[in-house]
Amino acid sequence: MPMRRGELYILLLVTLLHTNAIAQRSRAQFSDFLSHAYFGLDVGYINYPFSNDQLKEGFTSESIKVPHAAVRLTLLGYRFNKYLSAEINYMRPVSWVRYEDINGAKWNLPVFMNLATIVLKPSLPLNTDFSLNGEAGFGLVTRRGIEIDQNKLIEDATYASVSVGGGIGYHLNEKWELLVHASFSPSNNEEKQPATSFYSAGFKYKLRKLPEETVKRNSESGFIFPRQVLQIGYSSSQPGYGVNKFFSKKPLPIFWGGHAQVRRGVTLNYQRNIFHSRKVFSLEWGASVAYWKSNENGEEFYTGSLYPLLRFTVIRTKPIDIYFNYSVAGPSYISKTTIDEVETGKKFTFQDFMGMGVYAGKNRKLNAEFKIAHYSNGNLFPQNDGVMIPLTFSLGFTF
């Protein structure tokens, strides 16, 4: 018997509601990729024996200070299985190497240096609590040298190297692991770069699939986490750069400034939710394109970015929800690298931003937001003076 039109409408409605429920439920659980991801932090002792050998011939320093405190961030790790993982790491000293009293003159010049690595990490479980960990892979060494009166005493350098290491891990539980670790990157005679050794202690936090009861609670909470949002924004230096400077300097240095400054700009942003908790936290990815005009000379340039986004919806009321957001290290393209005579690096850079906003309306279909932003390459290249984006006001809608 042919299906009646009313029955067809009912079937279609049930299907749509079921599909929407599945979609909402799927965002309350970590994806397969995220459930194998982890993040980490190590602090410890770094050594690279900088000496007068790094200086240009004819120059000597009476005092070379090599601070040894350093940190290493595991920006992203991925567990293939219990025997093998891969990591992206970023390591830098807390304070820079300094050359003082050069050729009898009272100079105090810093050498900026950091190491980014992509490594494979084999692991050998010893028992349920301890494991031996290895490390081997690719390293990118970046050094910004020193100069006096446009005379380079230590050249800038960016080159590929290797990174090897190993350590012991103690598994507190299925999410937390404590680590003791050592790593090594060899010297490069051509670049006059000494070897780098790092000895550290730290932790690793692993994401895991959530229990079914937690997923059910998160997905059926009744709080709205918009699936997608599209925004258009306008940036202006008319209010000044006070907000940028406040959050990039003491007493609250939680963001970055920049030597090149933007006068105005227009942005287009797309964001998509991929995970949310019951009420407050959500994780999203986004994409943006933007047009900018510099503050000093009115130079035009463009950017395009992909980025992760952390959102914290801290206040929920009947008419609006209020949130704070923070995004860091979004891979980006920038069309111009010298802006108002400021050398910002290469055309590959990173986007960072922080802000606050609201979702409004019965189904939270309307969005308004303001934020500050920043572009820099994270010292992947010797020139890294950064671009400061002033307050940006955005309007958008969700769907």
Residue ranges of model-derived segments:
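Transmembrane beta-strands of outer-membrane beta-barrel proteins
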Residues: 37-41, 84-88, 116, 132-136, ...
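Outer-membrane beta-barrel translocator domains and adjoining extracellular loop/strand segments
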Residues: 51-58, 98-104, 144-152, 190-197, ...
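Residue-level signature of outer-membrane beta-barrel architecture
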Residues: 45, 78, 122-124, 168-170, ...
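Repeated loop/turn-to-beta-strand initiation elements of outer-membrane beta-barrel proteins
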Residues: 83-86, 128-132, 170-180, 209-214, ...
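Short glycine/proline- and aromatic-enriched beta-strand/turn motifs that initiate or cap beta-hairpins
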Residues: 23-78, 196-271, 396-398
